[in-house]
């Protein structure tokens, strides 16, 4: 006998719709969690085997029941009360789930602490539903590794196409879980394109915040300079709600100190359907027409929409440093330093406590762990862990100077812009090196059915402006379509 679910669940419910239904007694958080588990069983782990989910929280139903009871007896904590959320597998939780970053070496790693952002989610009343699959070590393993693959979890598939359709990464599972309606929300992380790429490839909204808006504490690191967590959702409204819940000053993360007085705990005031009217948006488009991720007609449609909605569109803007030959010294040296430090603090019973030990562990189970090799790890093994050498320091200084003063800030000031529009996620690198925010928005589908998206980018702590622009564009177009899972 099949389980019968509330017919309301057939639709992709938003946070606001769920809260209304819960207040009216039409659905419960427990029922919602059970429905998503059913979807995961039948479409993620069976059927088309999307494979976006790496681990399920065994306490999820209990947590949802407790929050349902609290709603009846004490009231609602806020908009996330009883709302299911998935976390990327590099975000620590103090529960019965593991935190492995997709590696087999850390498959038994259980944290004794919640990441700061997880503490925030629990206090807001969210139900942590589980962990999502990801590109192993946030794409720090191999130059040959396909986006969305991990030795522990296998390959994440794009729900909009066949197995060969690019899924984007490294927060692949987090984006796909939202796109395929296995959850309402998810949290990913980005160093460079890891939120923006899978968001555009899977037709969801992704926000890569200013570095420091969300605490990095409790996240398996890639760099110090560029790492940040950020939300995925099917609508800008839901992404904005989740973003506000994740912000806050963390005494354990100095990067968050600069957000004091600049971060918001509620971005709902930015959700203006007329937000494009009078906005000055610069268009940067250096993509060749033969790129698989670019569609000239769809991008021109975006520009026409901006113009129609009252924006002042300045095309072919100049960003002086965009095409410079960037040094990758920051990611090379900082991954060695940050990951070695993280591994060194792990409990003694775990098999690895350094990058060198991780490399040797993988070699010992080569057939399981090294489908794509580990050349990126091996390259970093010999790097020093002092962050004092000239190559690294000069790379760090150049990244900041050329991405900010001679990059994003230069263009914003020169043209008097509120934001810069990029097709797909081509602006990810310069924004990542600057530590500046971007928002990815669905912008239609190619003739093949492949999703197309655009990103709006701005200066530090301009998330409110970007949400305003993204929301107005979304409401004017309503491009997103649900994938067909069978």
Annotate each PLM feature.
Residues 25, 82, 88, 123, ...:
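Glycine-rich, small-residue loops and helix-cap segments
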Residues 208-300, 478-486:
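A short helix-breaking turn/cap at a secondary-structure junction
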Residues 20-24, 37-49, 65-72, 122-123, ...:
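Sec-exported extracytoplasmic/periplasmic mature domains
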Residues 1-107, 134-139, 258-263, 267-268, ...:
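Short, well-ordered alpha-helical
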Residues 113-250, 423, 433-455:
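Short glycine/serine-rich loop segments
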Residues 18-24, 105-109, 227-234, 456-457:
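Short, well-ordered beta-strand elements within core beta-sheets of diverse protein domains
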Residues 11, 236-265, 288-322, 334, ...:
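Acidic-enriched catalytic cores of C-N bond-cleaving enzymes acting on peptides and small amides
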Residues 81-101, 270, 275-284, 333-403, ...:
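Short helix-loop capping/hinge segments that flank enzyme active sites or metal/cofactor-binding pockets
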């Amino acid at each position: 006998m099949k389980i019968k679910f509330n017919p309301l669940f057939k639709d992709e419910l938003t946070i606001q719709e769920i809260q209304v239904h819960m207040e009216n007694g039409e659905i419960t958080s427990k029922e919602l969690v059970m429905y998503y588990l059913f979807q995961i069983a039948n479409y993620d782990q069976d059927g088309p085997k999307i494979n976006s989910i790496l681990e399920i929280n065994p306490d999820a139903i209990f947590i949802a029941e407790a929050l349902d009871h609290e709603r009846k007896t004490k009231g609602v904590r806020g908009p996330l009360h009883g709302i299911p959320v998935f976390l990327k597998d590099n975000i620590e939780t103090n529960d019965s789930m593991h935190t492995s970053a997709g590696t087999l070496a850390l498959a038994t790693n259980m944290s004794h602490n919640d990441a700061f952002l997880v503490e925030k989610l629990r206090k807001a009343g969210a139900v942590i539903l589980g962990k999502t699959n990801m590109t192993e070590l946030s794409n720090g393993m191999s130059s040959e590794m396909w986006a969305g693959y991990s030795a522990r979890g296998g390959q994440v598939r794009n729900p909009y196409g066949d197995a060969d359709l690019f899924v984007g990464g490294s927060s692949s599972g987090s984006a796909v879980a939202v796109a395929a309606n296995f959850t309402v929300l998810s949290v990913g992380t980005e160093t460079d394109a890891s939120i923006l790429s899978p968001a555009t490839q899977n037709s969801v909204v992704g926000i890569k915040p200013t570095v420091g808006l969300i605490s990095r504490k409790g996240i398996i690191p890639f760099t110090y300079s560029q790492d940040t967590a950020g939300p995925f959702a099917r609508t800008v409204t839901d992404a904005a709600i989740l973003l506000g819940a994740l912000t806050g000053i963390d005494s354990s993360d100095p990067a968050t100190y600069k957000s004091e007085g600049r971060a918001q705990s509620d971005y709902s005031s930015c959700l203006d359907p007329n937000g494009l009217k009078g906005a000055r948006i610069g268009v940067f488009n250096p993509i060749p027409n033969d790129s698989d991720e670019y569609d000239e007609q769809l991008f021109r449609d975006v520009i026409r929409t901006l113009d129609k909605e009252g924006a002042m569109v300045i095309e072919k803007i100049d960003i002086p440093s965009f095409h410079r030959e960037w040094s990758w010294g920051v990611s090379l040296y900082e991954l060695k330093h940050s990951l070695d430090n993280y591994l060194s603090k792990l409990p003694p019973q775990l098999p690895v406590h350094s990058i060198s030990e991780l490399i040797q562990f993988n070699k010992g189970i080569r057939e399981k762990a090294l489908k794509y090799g580990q050349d990126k790890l091996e390259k970093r093994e010999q790097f020093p862990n002092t962050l004092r050498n000239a190559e690294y320091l000069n790379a760090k200084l150049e990244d900041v100077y050329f991405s900010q003063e001679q990059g994003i800030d230069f263009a914003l000031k020169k043209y008097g812009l509120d934001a810069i529009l990029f097709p797909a996620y081509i602006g990810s690198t310069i924004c990542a090196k600057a530590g500046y925010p971007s928002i990815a928005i669905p912008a239609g589908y190619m003739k093949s059915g492949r999703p197309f998206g655009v990103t709006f980018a701005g200066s530090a702590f301009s998330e409110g402006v970007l949400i305003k622009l993204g929301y107005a564009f979304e409401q004017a177009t309503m491009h997103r379509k649900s994938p067909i899972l069978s």
